[in-house]
């Protein structure tokens, strides 16, 4: 069985649990994106599905290509714009639209996402989704989740506080887990100071930060199929 894309799983969760759409509506959107994926595959722009794209700028460029194609325009018009509606809704999701309003509902987005088992002795590089990272920052409203009073510069890119996404359990530990670590529950929004501190600060400070994060995220990690005791958690993140 092929591994299902994490962004597809999250998009379905988002439509059902956050947007409150019916199973029928969700099925229509997924069907529209299946057609979009076929269009992109036929032009050698993706390998399998649109959900494999982990960079939001690339996703936007693909939308421009799709919407400028005369064959797609005709097909979309015949389908009463159902295909463009599916893609527009997916990109709005990928951009983190409304994510700042779902912080209290974040548990509804957390699901286990199995990763393929890796065999053999070789160097492994685990992909990190820029889309998921940015969504996590949106969910945190661009506020440091360790020290909420910490300020930062205003970023030119989005005119929001500059924050950084930190994988609490490092991606290099992925081989020790059957479920993905590149998930919302494992990404915290940190100001640059706290991000440096959790990597390079004195051990006592890092322990305090780790304890706070564990308190805030333990249940969400469990929902994502990542179950660790406090001792196990701290031993991993303090490496």
Indicate where each model-derived feature is located.
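A glycine-rich, aromatic-flanked flexible loop/lid motif
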Residues: 1-7, 157-165
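Short terminal alpha-helical segments
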Residues: 1-25
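Non-catalytic DNA-binding core/recognition domains of DNA-processing enzymes
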Residues: 19-94
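Append "and, occasionally, other polyanion-binding protein interfaces
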Residues: 28, 131, 163-166
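Short, charged surface segments at domain edges that flank catalytic/cofactor-binding sites
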Residues: 106-157, 172-182, 237
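A detector for short metal-coordination/catalytic motifs
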Residues: 160-239
